[in-house]
């Protein structure tokens, strides 16, 4: 018998129909506990009326048969007995409830790092899980006794820094729930990475506000983009490059952990989304770095929460649910390709051939996620090397890719062919041939291999024209590059991350041995 029919029959029975508890079916576990406790303790109630144990069961099931009602005695005893049951049930419920940790609706200080971002509440079925988000993470509004400093803005929203409190608050303008969901998952991954593998290179989530559409993170000194521009203007030592090498190796471990262990592919790794802390002084050295901004992240095939729901306790009587939807799983090719500056060449070839992900309904595999994210991380490392490391011999920095604004920031075929030709010309002068980089083939992109993969004869002809143009304009420049010894390890790492063979990009032998 369903709950509605139970409640209906109990109310129609005429017992305390005006009481708010009369239409409520007790929880089964409470029913069993109360029934066993009453049977063990006594057979008569405090009014001296003998109670049949089967009458308890009939009350809980809501089946009040007319012939059996007389076992309770007169109606006066029935009402007092029903009140006694409800009183005992209230006591059991009070004992069962654990006192909730008090939390303030205002954010008045820097939140501490939580033990868990969310915990498993129940399993709905084999593939669907219900999680409870830690209630202490949510706040209604900020009430800090300081004025924030504007840090930046864009299509994503606005970021402000509270220096005294040492937090960064990101106000999301569009698609807040999607970014919140991915940030919650990434925040839990950050805690797992720190506790299991001591990886501290995923930005942790400190708090969030659904009414204000805000995310709270630890504050960092700057992003990697600002750091390498600053690095290009100072006197660098070997310690600077060793710190950069260690930082990008740790970031590589974090990327592999996100894709393989957490089933989360970032899809937007770049210098602007890597946040760093540096030492004080005129020649700052990298101390640590984290990967942030999971607004474009997707769950891949290694994820175990593809059909999950996350419940956020906003107030005592309001719960906001965040569900993993199709947009968090299915890759959209245009979003994966992005602006093309940090994406691997195989994605550009797919775009030129018109293949993409149009007929694909499954998530990205973890191997695809690793190859995309590691290549983007390698492109970020290449920007640092070329802008801050190669300006010893040249007064200007060498670009790692053709400039996007020349093509009005549109993903046109000539722009993609330009990138492919430029990488074929540049990387053969930078990437070293070592036992690590050559284990899975030649590390740089080769023109003859790309030419064979292009389906259109027009694209092949335009690709050859770009190669000829770069041979005229950039050959002497690239031949004159002088690679300093302290850059060899960094270039080897970049060659692995940006390897022409996607299998080599995990850099297993280098990162985990």
Swiss-Prot record:
Q: Which organism is it from?
A: Gallid herpesvirus 2 (strain Chicken/Md5/ATCC VR-987) (GaHV-2)
UniProt similarity note: Belongs to the protein kinase superfamily. Ser/Thr protein kinase family.
Provide the catalytic activity annotation.
Answer: L-seryl-[protein] + ATP = O-phospho-L-seryl-[protein] + ADP + H(+); L-threonyl-[protein] + ATP = O-phospho-L-threonyl-[protein] + ADP + H(+)
Q: Where does ATP bind?
A: 151-159, 170
Gene Ontology annotations for the cellular component aspect, listed alphabetically: host cell nucleus; viral tegument
Q: Quote the catalytic residue positions.
A: 268
Which key words tag this protein in UniProt? ATP-binding, Host nucleus, Kinase, Nucleotide-binding, Serine/threonine-protein kinase, Transferase, Virion, Virion tegument
Q: What class of enzyme is it?
A: transferase
Q: Posttranslational modification, per the record?
A: Autophosphorylated.
The protein's role, per its UniProt record: Multifunctional serine/threonine kinase that plays a role in several processes including egress of virus particles from the nucleus, modulation of the actin cytoskeleton and regulation of viral and cellular gene expression.
Span list, region Disordered: 1-27
Query: What region holds the Protein kinase domain?
Result: 145-487
Q: Which residues cross the membrane?
A: none
Q: What is its EC number?
A: 2.7.11.1
- The gene designation is MDV025
Xref: PROSITE patterns = PROTEIN_KINASE_DOM (PS50011), PROTEIN_KINASE_ST (PS00108)
As for subcellular location, the record says: Virion tegument; Host nucleus
One Gene Ontology term of the molecular function aspect: ATP binding
- Regions of biased composition (Polar residues) lie at 10-23
**Under which name does UniProt file this protein?**
Serine/threonine-protein kinase UL13 homolog
